């Protein structure tokens, strides 16, 4: 009579969960260097189509990479210079923001008896401090500037990635046991992420330009800074467009008026409706194959792991993880849970 074997399913699940916790803790601890690598990979993916475009027109790869990287550096240097001046001026005006906010709160206090509210202006000021209102903006800028601090290291990493990208399929063909499956998965991941980042960058650029022109026409101060913020936060799914509208609306409410604040809010709403809800779904479709809930949860998880840069790149990072799961034996079922809608067929076994 054979002795029944104990069920070790629970133990296996606990081991996998423990391994996941260790991996996530390691990623969180090494966030500084991982953010640098992710930014380099982001630039490499976005710039590689330009390099390919030059190569198809007879330009040698080293020359093409040099041209693209130099143009990128010139554009980033000019943008950072303009933003630094605007941001320093904005920081210097924060005391004026507090003073104006205090005046508005004292004016609001006259209405409190009619609203049956009992709160002193000092207490409201503590809750609505303008410095706290722009905390997220400052944290985002600080996170990006900190990640971009080692510009030389970042540029060198991008250059090496652009040189090595053409050799990756050949290396994998010799290194993997089943290269056809893994190369197909890698190709699908790179194609999906490249398509997503290219279109998202283009749509974010349109968003930033339209916001900048609209705010300039309204005479809003720091229009370029708010436009760049809208450009960056457009990478953040679901909540990015809402967050980018809050600081300029508060600024306009304090220094211009309620009517102008409504106009600024309407500008952001129209831009988000047209670009985010009409153009983006039509241009992208469901190429990344993730549900809305998974997109939102990935925003929270990657934001906790890697900070603001993790929030900006949460969708492509989760997409790569999903495609990697689909090419592994034990991860295909979990990949189905990350997908949108109902699965069309059951997995064998």
Swiss-Prot record:
Any Pfam family: AI-2E_transport
Periplasmic topological domain: 32, 84-142, 230-234, 279-292
InterPro entries to which the protein is assigned, alphabetical: AI-2E-like
Keywords noted in UniProt: Cell inner membrane, Cell membrane, Membrane, Transmembrane, Transmembrane helix, Transport
Localization in the cell: Cell inner membrane
Main location: membrane
Biological processes, Gene Ontology terms: transmembrane transport
Transmembrane segments: 11-31, 33-53, 63-83, 143-163, 209-229, 235-255, 258-278, 293-313
Membrane topology: Multi-pass membrane protein
Ranges per topology, Cytoplasmic: 1-10, 54-62, 164-208, 256-257, 314-349
Gene Ontology CC annotations of this record: plasma membrane
Protein family (similarity comment): Belongs to the autoinducer-2 exporter (AI-2E) (TC 2.A.86) family.
Name assigned to this protein: Putative transport protein YhhT
Species of origin: Escherichia coli (strain K12)
């Amino acid at each position: 009579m054979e002795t029944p074997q104990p069920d070790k399913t629970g133990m296996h699940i606990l081991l996998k969960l423990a391994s996941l916790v260790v991996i996530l803790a390691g990623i969180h601890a090494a966030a500084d260097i991982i953010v640098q690598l992710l930014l380099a990979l982001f630039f490499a993916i976005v710039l590689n189509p330009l390099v390919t475009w030059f190569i198809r027109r007879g330009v040698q790869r080293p020359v093409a990479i040099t041209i693209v990287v130099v143009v990128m550096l010139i554009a980033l240097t000019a943008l950072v210079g303009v933003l630094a001046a605007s941001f320093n001026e904005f920081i210097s005006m924060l005391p004026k923001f507090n003073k104006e906010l205090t005046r508005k709160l004292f004016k609001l206090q006259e209405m409190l008896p009619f609203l049956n509210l009992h709160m002193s202006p000092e207490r409201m000021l503590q809750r609505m401090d303008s410095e706290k209102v722009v905390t997220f903006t400052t944290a985002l800028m600080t996170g990006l500037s900190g990640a971009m601090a080692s510009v030389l290291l970042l540029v060198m990493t991008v250059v090496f990635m652009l040189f090595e990208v053409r050799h990756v399929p050949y290396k994998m063909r010799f290194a993997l046991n089943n290269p056809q499956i893994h190369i197909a998965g890698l190709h699908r991941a790179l194609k999906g992420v490249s398509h997503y980042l290219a279109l998202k960058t283009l749509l974010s650029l349109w968003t930033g330009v339209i916001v900048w022109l609209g705010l300039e026409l309204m005479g809003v101060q720091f229009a370029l800074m708010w436009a760049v913020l809208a450009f960056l936060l457009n990478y953040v799914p679901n909540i990015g467009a809402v967050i980018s509208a809050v600081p300029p609306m508060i600024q306009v409410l304090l220094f211009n008026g309620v009517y102008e604040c409504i106009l600024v809010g309407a500008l952001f709403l129209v831009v988000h409706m047209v670009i985010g809800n009409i153009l983006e779904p039509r241009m992208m479709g469901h190429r990344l194959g993730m549900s809305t809930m998974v997109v939102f949860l990935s925003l929270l998880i990657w934001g906790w792991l890697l900070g603001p840069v993790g929030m900006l790149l949460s969708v492509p990072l989760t997409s790569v993880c999903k495609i990697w799961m689909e090419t592994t034996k034990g991860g295909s079922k979990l990949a189905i849970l990350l997908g949108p809608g109902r699965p069309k067929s059951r997995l064998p076994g």
